[in-house]
A protein has these predicted regions:
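Extracellular/surface recognition and adhesion modules
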Residues: 1-4, 38-41, 101
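Short Cys/His-rich metal-coordination motifs, predominantly Zn2+-binding knuckles/fingers
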Residues: 4-11
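Feature responds to low-complexity, polar/acidic, surface-exposed segments characteristic
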Residues: 11-35, 48-96, 104-124, 132-163, ...
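Alpha-helix C-terminal capping/helix-coil junction sites
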Residues: 42, 102-103, 166, 170
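Alpha-helical membrane segments in multi-pass integral membrane proteins
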Residues: 159-172, 199
Length: 213
């Protein structure tokens, strides 16, 4: 099978809206909290399976995968002839996406010459990339009232460079917290974002921010 442009593994066809994700992927529970987001993303071709019948909702999302999704949101612009300084881009499926994201300022390298395509994306990193992408949309001016991150038990652990992006993302309803048995709500900014979490965030992004998706 051909390598998937979105996940780098095996191409799974984007399913039309009338076909339920749980019918296509054997590891999707239609009663799961993440089902709506997964259905939204696969029906629009924003995300696909890791193989024909597997979505892997609990798997991590890599930098290459998230950049590829944003590239699709941007309409897959032609990046022929556009280069990057990164020497670790070893797979063809994400080359154009990385070039686009780097050129537009949506993403930076992990060093002047490395992109680290296989590195898992953290929740705060995903928030920043989404807000950078949103800043390119006509008329988008961010949140009128960025969220108070101190409301989260771990709000103080959000990296300084990510605080503005995360505060906007929370205010726009893209990210929320997880409540423990003691009633404290955790944002988990440094944890790797799962594929299910990214699907949910992308669905919220499409509905709350990029209304034309």
């Amino acid at each position: 099978p051909l390598p998937c442009r979105r996940c780098g593994r095996t191409r799974a066809e984007a399913i039309p809206p009338e076909i339920a994700a749980y019918e296509q992927f054997h590891d999707i529970d239609r009663n799961a909290w993440s089902y709506d987001g997964i259905q939204y993303c696969v029906a629009r071709g924003l995300m696909s399976g890791t193989d024909t019948h597997t979505f892997l909702p609990g798997g991590v999302t890599t930098r290459a995968q998230l950049v590829q999704v944003l590239y699709h949101l941007a309409g897959d612009p032609d990046m022929t002839g556009v280069t990057t300084p990164f020497t670790d881009l070893t797979s063809d499926w994400y080359q154009a996406a990385v070039a686009w994201a780097y050129k537009t300022g949506v993403v930076d390298g992990t060093s002047p010459t490395t992109f680290s395509p296989s590195r898992p994306v953290t929740r705060e990193q995903a928030a920043v990339l989404l807000m950078r992408y949103a800043a390119r949309l006509p008329g988008f001016a961010g949140s009128d009232a960025p969220a108070d991150l101190s409301a989260f038990a771990d709000g103080g652990s959000v990296s300084g460079w990510a605080r503005a992006g995360m505060a906007d993302a929370v205010a726009l309803g893209l990210f929320g917290g997880t409540q423990d048995t003691g009633g404290r709500v955790w944002l988990r900014p440094g944890e790797s974002a799962t594929r299910a979490e990214i699907a949910a965030v992308l669905a919220r992004f499409g509905r709350n921010v990029a209304h034309l998706l």
